[in-house]
Amino acid sequence: MFLAACIAAVVMTGCKKDTPNVPDGGKGKFLIETTVKNPDGMSGSSFLQLVPDISGSIDNSNAIPLGFSSPVMAVDNSVFIFPTMGKDADNNIKRYTYDLSAQKLTGMVKMDVPANTMPINIIKVANRKAYVPFYTLGVVWIVDIETMQKTGEIDLKPYSHKDSSPEPAFGIVRDGLYYLPLDQINENFMPYEDYRQVDVAVIDTKTDKVQKIISEKTSKLSFPTRPMLRNMIFTDEHNDIYIACTGNFGLNPTYLNNGFVCIPAGSTEFDVSKSWDIKDNVIIGTDENYKPA
């Protein structure tokens, strides 16, 4: 792993566009994305670069220009840049290779994607095979990670609650199975009021087929993972999968449920006894009336 740190910085200022001379992304072992916002807070520029350390100050003279707040993800020695939303987006996924000896980003290849379909993460499932979920399209692309060519597709649209996509979010591979949470959200990017549950697609990484959809309905948790946040799904020291669920982000006083659900090691089903709704748990060190929701 070459990424000792990945830092996102937001600079609250307006500025004129720089025109650096063929930026190559710099040199170093720390990968940094910086975002310069315009006064409206909804537009601006982002930059990606390597730096030798994270002390002192840096500028963007060697940084690679990105779309505004483009998601960036590192997998082994590959760095993937995903498209942002909107009319100015680059509708492709770019992959750079990190040269460990030179400490440089090299060999950019890219794969075109449909506009505004929100591919935001990539999960490696074999030596050259990876899965890319498309949040608004309701499919998972099967991709050759070396050539960045699409080799197949997994259709998840039949599992949507109401609209055309179940919103496949951020998944994890365990024992040859890809566990992919489905957010099942409405046009306001919030859970359906009549569908407060957690759905996960269980996909065989050898056949690329959906084995089943598992659902946890007991806790009334919902919105399992966000597609850009890789640490919302993880395995613990027992190899149990835990999935963080945001619900309504605490914005609905009548529905504050948020917490974790669990798929234990050796099982492909939820264990509801390990579900944990944290809305009523006082955070140690805070006022006794302060709750996570």
Task: List the model feature ranges, each with a label.
Residues 161-224, 237:
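Solenoidal tandem-repeat scaffolds enriched in leucines and small polar residues
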Residues 11-14:
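C-terminal motif of bacterial Sec signal peptides marking the signal peptidase cleavage site
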Residues 36, 179-197, 242-259:
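Short, conserved, GDST-rich strand-edge loop motifs in beta-rich repeat architectures
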Residues 45-51, 95-97, 144, 193-208, ...:
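Beta-propeller blade signature
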Residues 18-26, 71-76, 120-125, 167-175, ...:
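Structural signature of eukaryotic scaffold interfaces centered on beta-propeller domains
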Residues 106-115, 154-166, 210-228, 269-291:
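Surface-exposed loop and turn segments in beta-propeller and other repeat-based domains
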